[in-house]
Amino acid sequence: MSFSFGFTSNDFDDDELVVQPDASFEPVQKNGKNDTHPNPLDSGFLLQPNVVQPKVENLETLLQGLKDVRLTFEEFQSPLYKMPLIRRELFDVKHQLMLETDTDSSNNSTELDILLGDTSEDLRKNVYEGGLKSWECSYDLVDLISEKIDKTINNIDAVLEIGCGTALPSEFLFKSALLRDDTSNNLKFILSDYNASVLRLVTIPNLIITWAKTVLTNEEWSALQKGESEDIPVSSEELLLSSNLLTAFYDDVQRRNITIVLISGSWGRKFNNLIHEVLLDSKKVLLLTSETIYQPDNLPVIAETILDIHSSPQTEVQTYVAAKDIYFGVGGSIVEFENYLNKKISSGNLPIRSERFKVNSGLKRSIICIETNQAMY
């Protein structure tokens, strides 16, 4: 693989992560050669009451909850290869949250305060993991994938994005699948985020907007929003999620044989068991994750999550992990992750190889490629 990114710090709003420390965290032990500690995926901490347990969210239920929501979105390009992308505006998400708060007082107040920006935190462990924002390394993945999009989209039957948030890499692949207009896609998107609210507020909305902008004619764009009411305003920068439009989205995705699976909750053994069930019939999987190793506590868990998914004998997996080289003020680093990963591969004599590629950027970022068996492309 060969690529050279030329991003500069001016390409992003490179906010420092502001994290509420969790003094109750139980450090995860690494498995050394003679180490009797359990796999980090089996850590008792991951089962504590304050940790959201993983579950598959019902897509139809999420779509029904978005009925009559008007989305304001931004069309923009990836920094290097100028790949077109779409994301829901953050102020629009906050507007929806405020409207929902006025009508439903049962919302998680702590999570809501962080989502609305009422605290100084970008995230808080086990409460909100930062998924509403689009972080720099997700753009790196988009530009990397774009280099080999034709081979990628034709050689995989599943995309798994862990810690997806706005899911820009998956959105890019989703659009590529839509452009094929092929009813024999047989392509599955598994999108996971700790917060179900993130899946509802940005992950699925971004896919719906991408679908509408990609497949609908101007007439369909207008008609599906207006229905029988000509008084409903239609804009090129907004999308009203009418019942007709949501039904059209759901039906068209099914017609194209594209499956969308949404998983909320924490990583760990229960999460991986769900993933293995969802991937049971998949032969070639592209696993993507960005900005998920920012805390040393998370690092062994995400590494073991990836290694466990690679362990399936009937599935060929290729993984891209995008991250900043060092997360100042938080403690995670790409070097520590790479060292942990390579130590496990070596000590376990695993049929997996990894390689790190530098992103040519003043922000100092990297992408680690992890492959099982032969590379898919």
Regions flagged by a language model, labelled:
Residues M1-Y377:
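S-adenosylmethionine-dependent methyltransferases
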